[in-house]
Design a protein with these regions (language model features):
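A short, flexible loop at the N-terminus of ABC-type nucleotide-binding domains that lies
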Residues: 13-19, 23-36
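The feature captures the beta-strand-to-loop junction immediately N-terminal to the Walker
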Residues: 49-51
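Conserved ABC ATPase signature
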Residues: 131-135
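Conserved ABC ATPase "signature" region
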Residues: 112-127, 149
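Catalytic Walker B motif of ABC-type/P-loop ATPase nucleotide-binding domains
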Residues: 156-159
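Q-loop/switch helix immediately C-terminal to the Walker
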Residues: 88, 93-109
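H-loop/switch region of ABC-family ATPase nucleotide-binding domains
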Residues: 191-193
Length: 270
């Protein structure tokens, strides 16, 4: 095999998924339109970011075969080789969490070291005896994440894993995710509204807006292009608001002020 042929062969072997000319419509409305090919390679962690209605969840559903689409999604993965954390999960609400976990995973916690490790890592031991409907929002997310991680899938999707959580709970949960995946080579597609959730966890960002691709590339490159050299996050109070009026503000939770610095001089001033 010639050198050029070998490179092409190796590239194909590393390719996990390719999207070609993808279109999703709900009635007459186009929810997602991807015109240029997008490639996902093994071991890559892709962050999909955009506002409500950008097409993020629609993309995940199309890849999983949960919604009709036109175009091509090329992959050798079978459905059972993919795992997905979706925004809504239909667990039995009145059953103890431990029983739900053991029934779905078909294993006993006391006999499964991997499951024990995840429960300990996410500090979930105190939740096992609770009924699902008694869990807090953050505890429910931890439960679903543990269930997803136990599948050890070739490709894992996380769709708005911090949806509905307060800022502190959201931060702590994402710190756990970053720590867990730090030294692993799992292939991930993570959907979020917030860039700061993805910054330490993903290699590339797919930025969607109104169903169209705005950009796709390395995380740091897109950060500099759309956010500047640095971002400062401050508590939103009258003093901070008054002192930072001349700087470029980014979208952020109501109790915070996020500011973009376009260069080192602006960063020094701030």
């Amino acid at each position: 095999m010639k050198n050029g042929q070998w490179k092409q062969h190796r590239k194909r072997c590393n390719m996990l998924l390719t999207i070609k000319q993808l279109q999703v419509k709900y009635g007459k409305q186009t929810a997602l339109q991807i015109n240029s090919p997008i490639n996902f390679e093994k071991g890559e962690r892709i962050g999909v970011i955009g506002s409500n209605g950008a097409g993020k969840t629609t993309l995940v559903k199309a890849i999983l075969g949960l919604t009709a689409y036109e175009g091509r999604i090329v992959t050798e993965l079978k459905p059972e080789q993919m795992a997905a954390h979706m925004q809504s999960n239909a667990y039995v609400t009145t059953m103890p969490v431990k029983r739900i976990m053991e029934m779905i995973l078909d294993t006993k916690i006391k006999d499964n070291k991997e499951l024990q490790e995840l429960i300990t890592f996410f500090e979930f031991e105190g939740c096992l005896s609770k009924r699902y409907n008694a869990l807090s929002g953050g505890q429910k997310q931890k439960f679903t994440i543990i269930m997803i991680m136990m599948q050890k899938a070739e490709l894992t999707f996380y769709d708005e894993v911090t949806s509905g959580l307060d800022f502190e709970t959201r931060q702590k949960l994402m710190e756990k995710m970053v720590e867990w995946y730090r030294d692993k080579e799992d292939s991930l597609i993570i959907v979020s509204h917030y860039y700061e959730e993805l910054e330490q966890l993903v290699d590339k960002i797919l930025l969607l807006d109104q169903g169209k691709v705005v950009a796709f590339g390395r995380t740091e490159e897109l950060f500099r292009k759309y956010c500047g050299d640095a971002i400062f996050i401050l508590d939103n109070n009258p003093v901070s608001s008054s002192l930072t009026k001349s700087f470029c503000a980014l979208k952020s939770p109501n109790h915070l002020i996020a500011l973009s610095c376009r260069d080192k001089e602006e960063e020094r001033r701030l």
